[in-house]
Amino acid sequence: MEVKEEKLMEEKQRLPEKTIPVFTVLKNGAILKNIFVVNSRDFSSPERNGSTVSDDDGEVEEILVVGRHPDCDILLTHPSISRFHLEIRSISSRQKLFVTDLSSVHGTWVRDLRIEPHGCVEVEEGDTIRIGGSTRIYRLHWIPLSRAYDLDNPFVSPLDASTVLEQEEENRMLEAENLEVAQHQSLENTTSGDEGVLHLDVTSEGTGSSVPSEDEDTYVTTREMSMPVASPSVLTLVRDSVETQKLQFNEDLQTSPKWDLDVIESVAEKLSGSFVRSTQQSGGDVEGLGCSELFDAAEADECDVRGDGGLHLNVISEKMESSVPNMIEAENLEVAQHQSLANTALGDDEDLHLDVTSEGTGSSVPSEDEDTYITTMEISVPLASPNVLTLARDSIKTQKLQSTQDFQTPTMWDLDVVEAAAEKPSSSCVLGKKLSGGYVEELGCFELFVAAEADKCDVRGDGSLHLNEISERMESSMSNKEDDPFLAAKETSSLPLSTDFINPETLWLVEDVQASPEFCTSSVKANAENPSSGCSPSTEQIDGCFETSGCSAFDLAAEVESLSLHQEVSEETEFVTKEVMGVSSEPLGKADIRSHEENGESEDSRQVIEVSAEPVAKADIQSHEENGETEGSRQVIEVSPKSFSEAEPTIEILTGEAQGIIGSEFPSELAVETESENLLHQKSIGETKNEIRSHEDYGETEDYGETECSWPDIAVSPSSVSPPEPTLEILTDEARGLLGSEFLSEVTVETEIENLLHQKSNVETKADILIHEDYGETEVSRQIITVSPNSFSKAEPTLETEDSRQQARGLVGSDSEFQSEVAMKTECENLLNQKRNGETKVSSRQASPVSDCLSTPKDRLSSINTDDIQSLCSSSQPPSESEVNPATDQDQESGIISETEKPKTELLIGSGRSEKYYSLSEIEGEENTDIGRLSRCPIPSALAAKTSEDTKLIEELSSSDSGSQENQTPETHAVRDDVLCDMDSSSTCNIWSRRGKAASVLKIRTNKSQGKQKQTGRQPKDKLHRKQALSDKSISLTIHHGAEILEPEIFTPDKENLTPSSHMLKRLQDIGDVKDSKSSLKLSGKSCSSLVHSSIAVLASEAFTEPEIFTPDKENLTPSSHMLKRLREFGDIKDTKGSSSKATRKPFFDIRMEENVMVEQEPEDLHSLGSKSKLKHEPLAPKKKAERAPFQPLLEKSSFQSQSYTEASSTASARNNISRGIRSSSNLSDAKSKMKWTIVLDTSSLLDKESRKPLQLLQGLKGTHLVVPRTVLRELNEVKRSRSFLFRRRTEIASSALDWIEECKVNSKWWIQVQSPTEETKAIAPTPPVTPQSNGSSAFPFSLHWNNYAPEIDSPTSEDQVLECALLYRNRNRDEKLVLLSNDVTLKIKAMAEGVICETPHEFYESLVNPFSERFMWTESTARGRTWSHLDNDVLRERYNDRACRRKSTYNRGESGAAAKGLKLILLHNSHYGHTH
């Protein structure tokens, strides 16, 4: 090697060697490869070019293109690199290299500076280049040409080599540090970072023992220790506070698979505080570990380490030397009692993990928990938020855990956990010790769990404290000063709760696995109490004995197997009694939460129990109230979405438990089952059944008899039932608690229904009416009853009897005091928040006091339908204008009845359900979406009776209209509208008054009339025309004295969010203007009749309200703008033509309607004719054009109704007008119909693979229709059957084309059509001349001429047959565009001669999707997401219009482009053929 190098040096000295540029590719500091920029001549003969540099090519400039395109010189495949990204120009003789960015999208960086598009930058040696979004770095070097061919010694630049060496040195240093850490077991830097996770990983290793770790993040091997170290910013161990921490391991391999761990930890004391240690010796000594400022959790962030965010103390026991004599070596013989002490630290996610692992010679304990490390036992205790549970420097005392395990029995072990409480200098905390053979009774903490602002822990499904204890022995070199009986006898003093320190109270961590080998916690008890009351710890033994030592708060023993219950305490500073339910992490089948209220009183206590856990099959929450009174308690039980498994979409209706509370005397059956079915169908998958059974010890609900109304709002939180988080807010428990705890009338339980109902957007809840009559008093609990449309049986409508209605009216009329309170207490916002999907919410708050109707046990609620609610709501309405002005109202009623001469006509307005279920209350609920507003004022029963009579009159008005639908007369509509206006005037306190609109705008419509509006559909438009004309001509008959001239208002029934069409409103206003400009009314002879007068009078009464649109019952029904254009154009055309005798004919009205009403202008008839001819033509549209599906009526009855109108109006003049309307509509819709394309295929377009891609993109596109001629199928079949080896590829393409046609026939049958044999036409040869020799000498040439061309005529080519097919379909469908797709130039020329558009499939597809093309099919569409709207139009035009030209200029090279000029002209002309510019 040295000889070669010397020779190379000599050659360099003699002659200058040619250098070439090389790019070294670096990624993450590692060299990936080198890119040598070598000329082709240099590559062919490196020796010659390497030895000498010729003068002629000294200034040769090499140009390289870099990009993603295959034609680039340097091909890079990163997706952020443009196809032609940058250009590199190099002059090797001068060692100059320049880079030019070719307007790349993501740019090019040289020396970390982005260069401008088309900007040229010189790159020097050592500079770096970054291309696009790629992380690779290209560093430029100049090397000798011969160096590039030295494959044995790859080129590495010194700069890159130093970088690689530095990286390797860093790796070696890190490995050395890790090895040192593993050898010395340095725990001084054990910190707990922002995630609040402290890992003390000490692996217990013995002969042949291996701990299988189930955690992903820890790597526990035989001689290696993995120590995750968090950020020390928050959780730091002060240097002065930690002197030494030593672990001493003593293992006895001779006895059994048991081991002892002695951990001796010495603790330093801070100047400001003293550390007190309490020890407990029960066969073993455990010393506490005290550290100052161990966890300052106030600043700690949420932890997401290891997926469960807990505080992990994984103590991996190692043999370590100890500076302290091992005092408990003799006690190693007692292998049944191993005690572990770990830092009881509080993480931010409220989890503490003490992992207990037992191992010995060949013993391995499998983990029961899928998340924990190797846990044989897991204790889960709910913790609170770190901002409350913070340990101050001086408030931290010793916390000791003493764990005793006995592995002699396989399924049983005992845990002794003793934790010494933290004390402030001014207070002390008792640690009750009870040493009974290794049993620990209690762990004293005062206010340990305060869940103020407790964050939800998305860790393992529950936010609880996990104590995964690794049983170890820990000792301290300090003396056992605290092993004093005085400490156990200390009294607990109640301290004010602060966010700076924790006052430990009693916490029971009791484990008993004798009954179950699944290591589930039997019970966890946490008692907390108000600061004002002292709490002495109560003890609980593992044997199951409960000893109560006088705790005045609730003692809640929670036995949970799969629910994690953590507390949520509101941010108020009130200290309320909380009952914390402990959990076990094992997801078992059923959870029983029993709440025992034992002796004691709790004043104004509030119990908040939130269930948030892993998949739960069934939760039985049983509430027992035992001797004692709870005054003013509020109970909200919330079930979090995580507590539901996504397997059973079931929701238990809360009324069932209410039935259990009230007893068999009050069966609540008002559509409870049907409503539960509806809810079950509406629920998304992911909610489990919650059965809540309430058991009351006394069997009855006793009320004190006051007439105060408590209002337990029973509702379901709605966002909780949304599909992503199926949550059910179980609020009936509060009703249960209220009814069962003897203070129903005392407490007004406002269970924050606003907070819950603002979430409820699209779920309806069902609550029953809870009415108790105890001691003769009526206790009324207010509720919201949601009546779903599906809850009513359409087949068997239950009609409420008149007697029950009178009873209801009498009850409400008599109890005016209660009624006023009910009316004033009504909250309409609840219904407004709940009403999102258009279900009718019936105000049962007025119906709830119907105690007389509710007294029967069997038919209490099943017989109550909305008629009762109607009567109640009617009685609670404010005084209408008829009450204020009775004389006028009576005149109105008598006038209406006498003029119309049909008092039995029913008011037919509604949503199509059974009309017997409809009442005034429900109608107002539909119209106003604000039920309670109408019932704010108490009304005497007399007005209720009168309103019921009015309602009865309205109900009786439907007898004639319920029959044939086409026998409608204008008087019927007039009566309906007049009664509607009467109702409008009576509803003053409605939703419109809140919005600043006059109350008379609102139309109250009952069932049949609304259905009729949906039936006739279009008839109200003509009525509005006549009304507008009458109002403009000032035909005023004083019916509404108090009516005002209102601004145009739109009536949108039954849908709160329905936005009316502004186009239709403009059209109606334009019609009114047109009518103003016309001549005066022409009255016919029959117009003087009383019928016409009455109809004019009633129409004039509504004429003061300007045009309104009635859109029937569908919130997504959008009026057709195309129809409106046709209507406007009809008006313009007929206005210019003037009056016509034919204009008085009305094809869509019955003959009798013409006889009754003849008061119209000629333009009115023309306008109505326009609207009706359109509707007459509309049912025929689906038969002819499939694209008109959006214009079809969306209601079920409308097709039948339009057919009935078609039959009823089948007169000659109607047919003439309709035919003219169809012709004019076809002319008007020409702009729309030109967007329909009939596509005829050629064989060449299917055999070309590139041409078939656009066809596949066109598949199923509305507005296009594909026709496949039969000759194309024949040709494809012939190609497929050809077995030629040379054309095997063509055979495969033909086979795939036939498969695609078959797939289209199956999947998109409406889109593709194969030409039928009857449609296929054959070319017929012309008849030859009779006498070929008749022309004398010219006969022979003629004969030869004929014979030469006769064979071609007899057998036409496939192109001719395809063209004939195209001409056939063009003549058949004149209103559609036809295009012939072919790549054959001959066929294109023939098609051009016939005037048929012929293009390639690619050109046709691009013309459809080009937004600047005349053929663009989505001109009226709305852009969604990122579309072309964010680019400049010029850029788009350049992109779309110049695409073909750029492609041709790119691929045509020189001579070939010149040779095809003529063909280009033909193709260019053809591509724009038929386009109208």
UniProtKB/Swiss-Prot annotation:
Keywords: Meiosis. Residues 870-883, 1213-1225 have a biased composition (Low complexity). Residues 589-607 have a biased composition (Basic and acidic residues). Residues 832-849, 885-897, 957-971, 1007-1018, 1198-1212 have a biased composition (Polar residues). Residues 64-115 form the FHA domain. InterPro entries: FHA_dom (IPR000253), PIN-like_dom_sf (IPR029060), PIN_dom (IPR002716), SMAD_FHA_dom_sf (IPR008984). Pfam families: FHA, PIN_4. Residues 188-218, 588-644, 789-818, 832-911, 942-979, 1004-1030, 1159-1225 are annotated as: Disordered. Disruption phenotype: Diploid pollen grains (dyads of spores instead of tetrads) due to defective meiosis II. Abnormal spindle orientation at meiosis II. One of its GO terms (biological process) is meiotic cell cycle. SUPFAM superfamilies: PIN domain-like (SSF88723), SMAD/FHA domain (SSF49879). PROSITE patterns: FHA_DOMAIN. Diploid male spores in sp1 mutants give rise to viable diploid pollen grains and spontaneous triploid plants in the next generation. Required for normal spindle orientation at male meiosis II and normal formation of tetrad of microspores. Not involved in female meiosis. This is FHA domain-containing protein PS1. It comes from Arabidopsis thaliana (Mouse-ear cress). The lineage of its organism: Eukaryota, Viridiplantae, Streptophyta, Embryophyta, Tracheophyta. The gene is PS1.
